[in-house]
Amino acid sequence: MYKKLEALNKIQHKNKSVAEVSNFLYSKELMNAPVALSEFFEACKNYPIFFAKDKDEKWFATVLLGYKQGENLFVDKKGVWKELHYIPAFVRSYPFILVNQEDKKEMVIAIEGEYLDEKESSKKLFNEDGENSEFLNSAITFLNQFYADSLGTADFIKQLESWELLEEKIVNIVNTKEEKFSFNGFFIINEEKLKHLSKKKKDDIC
């Protein structure tokens, strides 16, 4: 989804603005998207939610948007997201994203370079006094909230794991064209074990 990320810099980007993101074509090749616990209620109405681990062995939740790499079945050729379907916060945060610094001690805000310009019609990143614009502060708030929610989601999944509620699942799907797809490395909640979970633990989940 991101092709030319630039870490936000007050000096380098002091005169830069951000062009309007008018459609979702940027996500047309997004096969799956991370979601936070706060999104589960809406997201599960439209997409299957799975749990997985990243390269650092950290848990995250994700929704499946396509059957193969480079495919998002919910975005049409004009970049319109399928009507009445929830759009994940990760997708809505574009063209901004939080990324790890090299030392991994702090997260920094980065932006898709293709959307940077100096046009009057675009939204300024910084005011004339060099302070963050209202537009940028709004984006930062959104990113920080999603990041905090993602950390909480990882803790939630770790709790499920400690109660032995997770099971690895190989997902086999046949689409309308009779094409077969198989996915592994995903985990789901074992419903039978969940039924026998103590009331206290169920309350803790909720």
Describe the predicted segments one by one.
Residues D103-C206:
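A contiguous, surface-oriented mixed alpha/beta subdomain in the mid-to-C-terminal portion of proteins
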Residues M1-L65:
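Short, extreme N-terminal leader segments that mark the start of a protein/domain
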Residues F60-F126:
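Aromatic- and glycine-enriched beta-alpha-beta binding-site module
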Residues A43-N46, R92-S93, L165-K169:
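A short, compositionally biased
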Residues L25-K28, Q69-G79, D149-D155:
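Short, basic/low-complexity N-terminal boundary segments at the transition from targeting/disordered tails
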Residues P48, P95-I97, K193:
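Short, surface-exposed charged micro-motifs
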Residues C44, Y86-A89, L151, I189:
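Short, well-structured alpha-helical interface segments that form or flank functional binding sites
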